[in-house]
């Protein structure tokens, strides 16, 4: 039971950190890149392929963010089950 709790806590911590990294760094960067590329496309400095690539990159990161949030919640459920109680605190 202790090993399950340790494993679940480690998964919870990793998933929560990944979510924070996506929220604080990767998604804002991808949004900024898309806006810059969109502006460049509007004035003819970027081609349609570049705009499409920026949009796809943002969508992939948004999908990764959703999956990371799911992974965080599932790991927390596993931790609660291993401990037989509510996990301490709201975040790892």
Model segments located where?
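Amphipathic alpha-helical coiled-coil segments
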Residues: 1-64, 71-82
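Terminal intrinsically disordered/low-complexity segments used for targeting and assembly
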Residues: 80-92
């Amino acid at each position: 039971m202790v090993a399950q709790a340790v494993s679940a806590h480690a998964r919870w911590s990793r998933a929560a950190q990944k979510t924070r990294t996506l929220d604080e760094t990767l998604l804002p960067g991808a949004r900024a890149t898309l806006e810059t590329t969109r502006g460049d496309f509007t004035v003819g400095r970027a081609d349609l392929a570049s705009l499409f690539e920026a949009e796809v990159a943002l969508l992939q990161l948004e999908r990764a963010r959703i999956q990371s949030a799911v992974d965080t919640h599932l790991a927390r459920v596993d931790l609660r089950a291993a401990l037989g109680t509510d996990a301490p605190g709201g975040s790892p």
